[in-house]
């Protein structure tokens, strides 16, 4: 593995997600982005809607719609964190 790859890291995305015809390319893209933040032990992460929007080049409202769709399709779960205005997200597939 090259040093730049180790230094910059990477995310793993399940073929189940990438090959799912029920998921749009935007849903697959945001899911793949989330995978770069996922903890290796339980696939959980916390990243702001603002950061997702900024780094993916889409609006915050689009991010919110995509996250809601991924929850409805049971690809991720999201739970509001106590005492914070953030969500804990878990990748399910």
PLM regions and their residue ranges:
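Winged helix-turn-helix DNA-binding recognition segment
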Residues: 19-21, 25-26, 36-93
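Pre-recognition alpha-helix immediately N-terminal to the DNA-recognition helix
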Residues: 29-33
């Amino acid at each position: 593995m090259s040093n730049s790859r180790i230094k910059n890291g990477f995310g793993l995305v399940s073929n189940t997600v990438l090959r799912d015809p029920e998921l749009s390319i935007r849903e697959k893209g945001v899911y793949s982005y989330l995978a770069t933040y996922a903890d290796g032990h339980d696939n959980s992460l916390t990243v702001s809607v603002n950061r997702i929007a900024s780094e993916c080049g889409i609006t915050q409202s689009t991010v919110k719609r995509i996250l809601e769709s991924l929850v409805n399709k049971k690809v991720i779960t999201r739970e509001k964190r106590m005492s914070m205005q953030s969500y804990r997200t878990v990748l399910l597939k």
